[in-house]
Curated annotation (Swiss-Prot):
Region of interest (Disordered), ranges: 571-618
Organism: Mus musculus (Mouse)
PANTHER family xref list: SODIUM-COUPLED MONOCARBOXYLATE TRANSPORTER, SODIUM_IODIDE COTRANSPORTER
Post-translational modifications reported in the UniProt record: Glycosylated.
Gene name per UniProt: Slc5a5
Stated name of the protein: Sodium/iodide cotransporter
Binding site for Na(+) 2: Q72, Y144, M258, S416, F417
Top-rank taxon, per record: Eukaryota
Length: 618
């Protein structure tokens, strides 16, 4: 196809930038309007959880948008084009994550009425564990947000000439502005708009690509003939980058670390008015994730079919797989000015949603875990002012450190999942130990966190220094045999019918023994390694140092106690006594909206304590 063979670099035009600017302006307008409506925020709880009065549908769509950033918009289609439609198994991993979150983590966090996830670690273990979890979260979120902001700007610059700093500053300043002014409500409602933009962008690309390639049956037939319809890949080899098992086992644990215990997500579902609505939000989130991932994977298959005889990676038109998607958009919409701008808006909608989520969440844990424990008597208005200031500082910091993500190799999708897997995987193990193993103690969980982080970081660094070969990872073949344009750069020797990239492993005599075994494990297993190491080490050390007695634990901290737990922290107007809660049921009771200064939910002072009536002082 002519567009597939063109050697000159295409660029975005005025109409494209106009569409992009419109998306930024609408996002800003929504965020400011929601944030300033009804007099703004009167307390830190209003700023971070919207007063715990949010509806299920917008929260669910916000949950879906939070980790569906430009990294996924660019990375998922590229991976599907290179590895096939088996990428759809990720949806199964996400479904398992949603079920486990709804059954295990959500009830505990919601009924405790926490704003910061890491408050749980202090209630269950000690302040040292809480601070350790907070620090790990802040580091992981800073790195992840850096990838989300910088990588798409770099990729679009390399393909289209889009100015890196213009895109960084425009998106960074705008999301910092509406997050600082509007808080949680602004983040949620702009996320809803941005999910719609992402889906419309994918569907327009799908429709145009399928039409150009002769219809859906022709696309499926060509993809099948080139091994891209490969859902039945059940290879148990953990070194295969993508199989049913990597998505369902490794992928579900990575997503669980993002949704089950990650501050950004927990902060959203505890903002719902009732526990039942919070679970409904997770269901809406699952539907949103399925639509986004399925649309992105199908775009990848259409993209492969479009370039099947003239792979731009082999011909030198692009330098990395992540650049496939913007090139495809410019090629198939070259005669439709303004439509490529929709893709630009699609990509940066994901960036805005993730960055704003991260900024708000980092401000929340800083206030709840570092400021309020030391200054419990701060007035609500002062806390709001501090929260807004922290949002501005974190937004500025994310912009400043975004360039660090350029040090990560292997593609933006791998980079983002590696960061979350390495750092958040051990945290998932710590929370799971706390909720499921009554015997686990502070020395045990701290030892487990250290061991889990060390193991997952070891394999991630090893894989970066000694990357596995494409044959080991399972990259499918591509071709440049159909290229005829003289302006196309010459392919490397033997490039036809092969994929260009990392050379096959095993040829370098200097590679360590682990290079083709332990270091070659799929990056989706990094989180599982960290989680399992944390749990095993934490359990062992706990029993060796003297297990915690179950009777010494406060109510509401163990999952096993949920069956006999009959109440949750609730506003006075909704429930004032234990008898009321028995009638209404825990899933209908909203989480607490306010707590007295210096409140510490422990043993007999905790509203969940079964020896007292459930009553809050509002």
């Amino acid at each position: 196809m002519e567009g597939a063979e063109a050697g000159a670099r295409a660029t975005f035009g005025p109409w494209d930038y106009g569409v992009f600017a419109t998306m930024l302006l609408v996002s800003t307008g929504i965020g400011l309007w929601v944030g300033l409506a009804r007099g703004g925020q009167r307390s830190a709880d209003d700023f971070f959880t919207g007063g715990r009065q949010l509806a299920a549908v917008p929260v669910g769509l916000s949950l879906a948008a939070s980790f569906m950033s430009a990294v996924q918009v660019l990375g998922v289609p590229a991976e599907a084009a290179r590895y096939g439609l088996k990428f759809l198994w990720m949806c199964v991993g996400q479904l398992l994550n949603s079920l486990l979150t709804a059954l295990l983590f959500l009830p505990i966090f919601y009924r405790l009425g926490l704003t910061s996830t890491y408050q749980y670690l202090e209630l269950r273990f000690s302040r040292a564990v809480r601070l350790c979890g907070t620090l790990q979260y802040l580091v992981a979120t800073m790195l992840y947000t850096g990838i989300v902001i910088y990588a798409p700007a770099l990729i679009l610059n390399q393909v289209t000439g889009l100015d890196i700093w213009a895109s960084l500053l425009s998106t960074g300043i705008i999301c910092t502005l509406y997050t600082t002014v509007g808080g949680m409500k602004a983040v949620v409602w702009t996320d809803v708009f941005q999910v719609v933009v992402m889906l419309v962008g994918f569907w327009v690309i799908l429709a145009r690509g399928v039409m150009l390639m002769g219809g859906p049956w022709n696309v499926l037939s060509l993809a099948q003939n080139h091994s891209r319809i490969n859902l039945m890949d059940f290879d148990p080899d953990p070194r295969s980058r993508y199989t049913f098992w990597t998505f369902v086992v490794g992928g579900s644990l990575v997503w669980l670390s993002m949704y089950g215990v990650n501050q950004a997500q927990v902060q959203r579902y505890v903002a719902c008015h009732t526990e039942r609505k919070a679970k409904l939000a997770l269901l809406v989130n699952q539907l949103g994730l399925f639509l986004i991932v399925a649309s992105a994977a199908c775009c990848g298959i259409v993209m492969f079919v479009y370039y099947k005889d003239c792979d731009p990676l082999l011909t030198g038109r692009i330098a990395a797989p992540d650049q496939y998607m913007p090139l495809l958009v410019l090629d198939i919409f070259e005669d439709l000015p303004g439509v490529p701008g929709l893709f630009l808006a699609c990509a940066y909608s994901g960036t805005l949603s993730t960055a704003s989520t991260s900024i708000n969440a980092m401000a929340a844990v800083t206030v709840e875990d570092l400021i309020k424990p030391r200054m419990p008597s701060l007035a609500p208005r002062k806390l709001v002012f501090i929260s807004k200031g922290l949002s501005f500082i974190y937004g500025s910091t994310c912009l400043t450190v975004a360039a660090l993500s350029s040090l990560l190799g292997g593609g933006v999708l791998q980079g983002s999942f590696t960061v979350m897997g390495v750092i958040s995987g051990p945290l998932l193990g710590a929370f799971t130990l706390g909720m499921l193993l009554p015997a686990c103690n502070t020395p045990g969980v701290l030892s487990g966190l250290t061991a889990g982080l060390a193991v997952s970081l070891w394999v991630a660094v090893g894989a970066t220094l000694y990357p596995p070969g494409e044959q080991t990872m399972g990259v499918l073949p591509t071709s440049a045999a159909g290229c005829t344009n003289a302006s196309v750069l010459p392919s490397p020797p033997g490039a036809a019918n092969t994929s260009r990239g990392i050379p096959s492993s095993g040829m370098d005599s200097g590679r360590p023994a682990f290079a083709d075994t332990f270091y070659a494990v799929s990056y989706l297993y990094y989180g599982a390694l960290g989680t399992l190491t944390t749990m095993l080490c934490g359990a062992l050390i706990s029993y060796l140092t003297g297990p915690t007695k179950r009777s010494s634990l406060g109510p509401g901290l163990l999952w096993w106690d949920l069956a006999r737990q009959t109440a949750s922290v609730a506003p006075k107007e909704d429930t004032t006594t234990l008898e009321d809660s028995l009638v209404k049921g825990p899933e209908d009771i909203p989480a607490a909206t306010k707590k007295p200064p210096g409140f510490r939910p422990e043993a007999e002072t905790h509203p969940l304590y079964l020896g007292h009536d459930v009553e809050t002082n509002l």
